[in-house]
Every structure is written in C-alpha cells, then in structure tokens.
C-alpha cells in the first residue's frame, strides 16, 4: 500500500528532522531540508553571497513575498530530478522560471572559490544573467561546467546520502537554522533585501556572441539546439564581472593561413591584439578539424598562469593535456548517458572540449599570483 505524500513527509518529520544536541552545528546559517527520503542540511554562505542568501532565507521564513499568509517556500516539491546532475525546486506547484508568479528577480553573485565541483552544492536556477528568482537546485555530482553561470550559495554538510534517493514530485519542507550571534543578526527583510539589491553588480556583457565578445563560434561548430555559444559567452563575461580578468575564446572549424599568420600560433597572438587583450588577458582558440587548442596569455597574467617560472610552452602543453583528459571524461559520461541509440556528434565533442578548456582556465585564473 502506498502512503499519501503528506503522510510520507510527516513520517520523515517524526523520524528526526530536528537536530539533536549530539548533532550540534558550528556557528553559521543553515537550511534543513526534510524530505520523504530523509533530512539533509546545507550551510548557507551568507557572508560571501548575502543577496542570494537573503532571498532564499526570506522566502523560506516568510519575510519576503509571503503567499496566503505563509512563507513562499510552502508546499514545495522536487519537480526536476536528473540523476547524477541536479534536483531542482523553488517555485511552488510550478516548473518554469519564466512564470509570472516569481516573487522578485535579482542579479547573480559570483565569488571565486564557490564552485559546483561536488555533490550537495546549493545554487540558483536561472534563465540567463541576473534572472534569479525563487528556483534553486542541489548538485548530485561534479557540475563544474555550471560555474559562472549559476550562483552557488550553499553546501550540503549533512545527509549527502539522501540526495540521490530523491524522487520526482517528492514533497519537502525547509527550516532555517541560525547558530551564533552573526547568523542570528542576519536579516532577510524587505529593507535589507532592497539595499543588497541596489548594491548588486549587474551584468554588462553582450546578450549574444559576436566578433568583439568574450566568446564566439562564428561558423556554428558547437551544437545549436541549446545555445551553447551564448552560454559560454555569459560564462566568460560573468567571470570578468566577478574577477576583473578577461578570458576570451574562439571556436573555428579549421585554420585558414593568411599572409600575416601562416600558422595557428601567430594567428592566436594577432587575434589577441585585435581584441585588445594581448597584454592583460587570455585567449583560447580551438580548431575543430585538428581537435587542438592554442592559448595566448598576456604578460600581466603570466604570473598567475606560470607562478613557478617554468618554460611557458611546458605549462601550455600541460594545460592542453589536462584539457584532453577532461574532455575525454566528459565524452565518456555523455556516451554512457545517451546509450548506443543516440550517438554523439562532432559538435558535441567540440562542446566537451570547450567545457574542459574553460573549466581549467577559470579555475587557474581565479587564483592570485604567488608573492
């Protein structure tokens, strides 16, 4: 006999949704998720990303956008469950971030070091830059490719084993836990949210990729069913918004020699000059027919790229090898997920190579040079 969803959730509550003295948490702000499969707890990064956390806490506690006298986050279900990827919720009874019932929108908050690199990261769903509202997701594995596209604002510290057990349409509740004076003092009221919103750094990058933008795929080498080039451009523009550092990338079907650049290396250097990033930026160029990358690093960023003063070509070759390995891993995961009846296309393989290169470059250039 199958129990109604409400009884299953009640059973989970009675089984121990409240933390005991033995499970005492360190000072901080937390969200306790009670599901039919068990309880998991996420630490909220309220000091690093206060706007995002204020929205989440306000919607959970009812201080922002209450619905019918109850917190907005009442009656939630996990309406998107992708095994090995994410579980998603946040819009009661709805499944689309484009719906008019979203209580508010606010800009992204990207902080170096907050990454989708492991299971249990709590992050905002969106429909593009600065379209955060109420929907959030929790990662079910390494989702590094989501970095600088979605704002990470929490990390699961207890109950990781619960996450892969979540089923579509499982009901759940959220309880905010405040431990310590700083967490107790953190406000999520309309005035605080409005002040944080006014101080937010807005997206100023291009809406579409093009000749002068951070990313471009002029010949449409990458898949177009989902706008991959557009999303890669958002990612690199967001990285610059967060760090001040410019990383550009270009994808071409093949290299075409010119009088000025008879081989890919000088072509990449000349392109960096024409884009205005020759001295202070990074340019990665991919030629699909060779499945090969060429990277230019400006002198201003060379201490970050090569902090140990090795031969620059050795460092680049190590990067290229790491990209190959990471792209191969992405490819194998995709093949396994698709199965033999839905083989990968050349455009997909190019996409995984771009994922790998950008993941590694963003990780490298988040860091500071050695003193």
Language-model segments: residues:
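Cyclophilin-like peptidyl-prolyl cis-trans isomerases
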Residues: 19-209, 233-234, 370-371
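Flexible glycine-/small-residue-rich
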Residues: 35, 126, 140, 251, ...
């Amino acid at each position: 006999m199958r129990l109604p969803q409400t009884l299953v959730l009640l059973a989970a509550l009675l089984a121990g949704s409240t933390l005991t003295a033995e499970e005492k948490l360190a000072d901080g702000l937390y969200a306790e998720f009670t599901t039919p499969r068990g309880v998991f707890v996420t630490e909220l990064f309220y000091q690093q990303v206060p706007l995002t956390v204020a929205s989440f806490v306000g919607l959970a506690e009812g201080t922002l956008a209450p619905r019918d006298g109850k917190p907005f986050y009442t009656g939630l279900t996990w309406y998107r469950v992708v095994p090995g990827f994410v579980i998603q919720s946040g819009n009661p009874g709805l499944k689309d971030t484009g719906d008019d019932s979203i209580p508010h929108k606010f800009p992204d908050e990207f902080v170096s070091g907050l990454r989708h690199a492991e299971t249990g990261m709590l992050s905002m769903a969106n429909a593009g830059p600065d379209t955060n509202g109420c929907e959030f997701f929790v990662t079910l594995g390494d989702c590094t490719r989501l970095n600088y596209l979605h704002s990470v604002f929490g990390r699961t510290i207890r109950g990781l084993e619960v996450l892969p057990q979540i089923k579509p349409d499982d009901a759940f509740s959220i309880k905010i836990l405040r431990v310590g004076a700083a967490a107790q003092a953190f406000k999520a009221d309309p005035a605080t949210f409005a002040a944080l919103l006014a101080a937010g750094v807005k997206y100023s990058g291009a809406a579409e990729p093009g000749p002068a933008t951070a990313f471009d795929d002029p010949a449409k080498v990458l898949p177009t069913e989902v706008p991959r080039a557009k999303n890669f451009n958002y990612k690199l523009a967001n990285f610059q918004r967060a760090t001040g550092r410019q990383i550009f990338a270009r994808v071409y079907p093949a290299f075409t020699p010119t009088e000025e650049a008879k081989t890919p290396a000088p072509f990449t250097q000349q392109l960096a000059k024409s884009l205005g990033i020759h001295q202070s930026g990074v340019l990665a160029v991919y030629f699909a027919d060779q499945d090969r990358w060429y990277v230019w690093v400006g002198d201003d960023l060379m201490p970050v790229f090569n902090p140990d003063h090795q031969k620059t070509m050795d460092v680049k070759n190590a990067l290229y090898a790491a990209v190959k390995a990471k792209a191969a891993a992405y490819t194998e995961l995709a093949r396994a997920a698709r199965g033999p009846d839905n083989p990968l296309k050349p455009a997909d393989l190019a996409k995984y190579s771009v994922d790998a290169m950008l993941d590694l470059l963003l990780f490298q250039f988040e860091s500071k040079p050695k003193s």
